[in-house]
């Protein structure tokens, strides 16, 4: 399963120069980006990242990462100071989900595959341990057959054992297991409990808490120290001060105090002091007036929360640790104008792995050695775009017809001016998700072809607080669609776009919004493009029902889609309304999609062809709810270009 990677070494050698950036200097990226003649080949935008999810070993001596070699995803491990002799581990048909270290010589690898349970194809995961000195791979916890298998709660500093939360099957809640990495022995450290999906351990390896949800109320099962029984701390229902959702917990070992991330107080996720003994939420450690915090960063040794992560127009971190705050400032001085994220660090914080990039920069990984006062490039994930000038992306706001302020991302094509340009509006998938200020190949491809691209954060998008999400409940095809249309109207009023040259495009929920926009508002759009779009909302609800572990969870999801008034979903579904379509559409889907079944697209294409509608379609046999084959994505991009050239030319 492992071999020495000569080809890999050559590739890394090309990517990893001897260039070093002194932190005292104000140098930017490793190389300036010259202007590039357009159009850039579709293949450059279809490139999958060469390297992803890199992580430093605890001693800072090695880097493990996911790499794409010869069209196959593999795990690579190489010395941080000598990247020319990597180890390469074959993955076969497994997907890499997560990479971690257990000590300096062992990599923990969570991999995913699909298994069939009761005629349902369900993604499951497995946890592997890779011993670097012997190049051996061991499957841990052979009984685990759930979606969750690699939630590592605690790793022994010496790398000898770990605590992991895992399911025995996809429908049960996880238990916590102690795994001896030398022998592979597995012991139950904490039995599974009803409705407890999240477990937490402290820096001493003690399972301190689990969070359960039932009947719109959270319960924290908590113990003060090892040997104590778990006791229940129940949250309040309704609109009480401490109702809401708990996202995360952290502890101070041997103490009843800790940190809780919850939206209980303001409807936005924020970090608060928490007394586990009394179940009392205390003063805020950090809350943002506009957006949720997304996660907390924990010191790898002490387990103390060192930073708070949040995302407004771009990803940011507020360091609570003064040392890390100073380190971040030095990094941003050396690599200005980008999102500079510390993705991994050695236990002594001397070496840090940094990702630096943004919406118009596919990014570069750097290794920062503090003692040497040096930042050196490790790899550029997208090698074909290394010298390509990409279009700028701005965070904007506009007002919906009912007065709601909506954030969005606006991309303007280079060298085209800013008046009466063609537009592609691109609502995101989810729909309970959000866009971010990161490189998006579809956005940049469209901009490279001369199109303005608007990515609206319609109501229901996450990250902007509970109230904003709930405004989207029951609004599929209604107010959520209004928000997309209102974004087009706003841009038209600015004069930036030509109202007669607008197309709508998206994937998953975004694909639904594209098809529904074409049916509902043909006067606004010249064409629509859908990848893996939902065409029958009621059918997708019934399809999703099989993956819920209890009827009440399905009912909650059903309410989010159909609303409290349970509208007739056929009235907002493209398939039942196919006869109303009058503009050209392009429909695409991966045949291995288990999120939106391909039959939704096939049925829509058949219905439109029977009515002699202007429909083009393509189905990719080896792809799922996204592209895993660059050649397929390149083909799709070329089809998009040809389709737009015919129906919405730039």
PLM segments and residue spans:
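Beta-propeller folds
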Residues: 18, 28-352, 359-361, 368-371
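Gram-negative bacterial Sec-dependent N-terminal signal peptides
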Residues: 8-28
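Flexible loop/turn segments at secondary-structure boundaries
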Residues: 267-269, 292-294, 313-315, 360-363, ...
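Active-site-proximal cap/loop segments of hydrolase catalytic domains
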Residues: 458-650
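Structured core elements
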Residues: 259-260, 306-307, 352-354, 366-367, ...
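An N-terminal hydrophobic leader/cap segment in hydrolases
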Residues: 361-396
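Cap/lid segment of the alpha/beta-hydrolase catalytic domain
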Residues: 384-500, 507-508, 542
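Conserved hydrophobic/aromatic "anchor" residues
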Residues: 56, 65, 101, 398, ...
């Amino acid at each position: 399963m492992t071999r020495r990677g000569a080809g890999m070494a050559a590739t890394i050698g090309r990517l990893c120069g001897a260039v070093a950036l002194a932190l005292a200097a104000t140098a930017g990226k490793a190389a300036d980006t010259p202007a590039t003649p357009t159009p850039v080949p579709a293949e450059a935008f279809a490139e999958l990242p060469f390297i992803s999810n890199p992580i430093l070993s605890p001693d800072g001596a090695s880097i493990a990462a996911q790499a794409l070699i010869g069209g196959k995803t593999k795990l690579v491990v190489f010395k941080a100071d000598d990247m020319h002799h990597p180890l390469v581990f074959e993955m076969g048909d497994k997907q890499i989900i997560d990479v971690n270290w257990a000590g300096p010589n062992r990599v923990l690898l969570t991999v995913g595959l699909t298994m069939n349970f009761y005629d349902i194809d369900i993604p499951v995961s497995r946890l592997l341990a890779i011993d670097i000195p012997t190049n051996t791979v061991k499957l841990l916890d052979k009984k685990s057959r759930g979606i969750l298998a690699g939630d590592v709660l605690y790793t022994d500093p010496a790398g000898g054992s770990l605590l992991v939360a895992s399911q025995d099957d996809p429908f049960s809640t996880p238990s916590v297991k102690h795994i001896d990495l030398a022998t592979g022995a597995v012991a139950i450290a904490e039995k599974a409990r009803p409705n407890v999906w999240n477990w937490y351990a402290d820096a001493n390896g003690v399972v301190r808490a689990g969070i359960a949800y039932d009947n719109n109320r959270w319960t924290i099962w908590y113990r003060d120290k090892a040997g104590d029984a778990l006791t229940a701390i129940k949250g309040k229902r309704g609109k009480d001060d401490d109702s809401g959702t708990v996202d995360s917990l952290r502890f101070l070992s041997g103490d009843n105090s800790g940190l809780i991330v919850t939206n209980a107080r303001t409807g936005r996720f924020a970090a608060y002091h928490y007394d586990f003994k009394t179940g009392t939420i205390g003063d805020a450690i950090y809350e943002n007036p506009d957006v949720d915090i997304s996660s907390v960063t924990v010191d790898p040794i002490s387990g103390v929360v060192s930073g708070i992560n949040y995302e407004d127009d771009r990803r940011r971190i507020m360091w609570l640790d003064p040392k890390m705050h100073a380190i971040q400032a030095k990094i941003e001085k050396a690599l200005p104008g980008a999102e500079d994220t510390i993705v991994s660090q050695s236990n002594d914080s001397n070496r840090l792995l940094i990702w630096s990039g943004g919406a118009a920069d596919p990014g570069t990984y750097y290794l920062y050695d503090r003692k040497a006062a040096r930042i050196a490039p490790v790899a550029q994930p997208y090698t074909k775009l290394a010298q390509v000038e990409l279009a700028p992306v701005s965070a904007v706001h506009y007002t919906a017809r009912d007065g709601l302020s909506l954030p969005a991302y606006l991309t303007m094509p280079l060298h085209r001016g800013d008046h009466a340009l063609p537009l592609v509006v691109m609502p995101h998938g989810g729909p309970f998700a959000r866009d971010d200020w990161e490189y998006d190949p579809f956005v940049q491809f469209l901009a490279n072809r001369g199109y303005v691209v608007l990515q609206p954060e319609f109501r229901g998008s996450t990250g902007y607080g509970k109230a904003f999400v709930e405004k989207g409940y029951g609004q599929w095809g209604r107010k959520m669609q209004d928000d997309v249309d209102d974004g087009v109207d706003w841009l038209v009023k600015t004069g930036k776009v030509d109202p007669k040259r607008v197309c709508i495009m998206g994937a998953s929920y975004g694909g639904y919004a594209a098809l529904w926009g074409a049916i509902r508002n043909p006067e606004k759009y010249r064409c629509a493009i859908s990848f893996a779009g939902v065409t029958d909302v009621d059918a997708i609800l019934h399809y999703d029902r099989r993956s819920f572990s209890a009827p009440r969870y399905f009912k909650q999801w059903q309410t989010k889609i159909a609303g409290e008034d349970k509208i007739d979903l056929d009235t907002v579904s493209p398939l039942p309304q196919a006869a109303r379509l009058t503009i050209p559409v392009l429909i695409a889907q991966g045949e291995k999609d288990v999120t939106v079944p391909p039959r939704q697209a096939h049925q829509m294409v058949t219905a439109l062809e029977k009515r002699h509608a202007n429909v083009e379609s393509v189905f990719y046999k080896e792809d799922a709810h996204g592209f895993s084959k660059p050649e397929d994505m390149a083909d799709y991009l070329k089809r998009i270009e040809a389709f737009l050239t015919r129906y919405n030319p730039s």
